[in-house]
């Protein structure tokens, strides 16, 4: 009986930890899509990297790795917020890597027009975080963009 009671007390703690990680990811994504360096830079680890891959039907894939410095400079040059759709909390999946690290992934769908044709644009986003100095820092970030003609 004591074991059941202990488990009932532990389940909300585990659920709250997962919700907190979802909030960490959503805050990170919002700062990234804001293109505001003052919001985004403090969330990044020293060696943060981002890699974006475009998957174009009938053509192939192209991956662009970008350093932290390159990304922040690009944000400074174009500080206008992105119009890309934001992730919803219910679409964020958390993967615990260790006591100090986790990764969060999400998916968004949008419709875009390219060369006069309508496409579905699906983004698979993943960011990994490390807990350091009482906060989470993003250590890596990948975005896979898939297009499908409608």
Where are these regions (language model features)?
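A solvent-exposed, acidic/Ser-Thr-rich amphipathic alpha-helical stretch
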Residues: 42, 46-93
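Short, hydrophobic/aromatic-rich segments at coil-to-beta transitions
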Residues: 22-24, 100-105
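Hydrophobic/aromatic beta-strand elements that line small-molecule binding cavities or substrate pockets
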Residues: 71, 89-95, 108-110, 122-131
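Short, low-complexity N-terminal intrinsically disordered segments enriched in polar/charged residues
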Residues: 8-42
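Positively charged n-region of N-terminal signal peptides that target proteins for export
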Residues: 1-4
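Short beta-strand edge/turn micro-motifs at domain boundaries
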Residues: 101, 118-150
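Generic short beta-strand segments
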Residues: 49-51, 106-112
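Short, cysteine-centered beta-strand-loop-beta hairpins and adjacent loop/turn segments enriched
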Residues: 81, 110-120
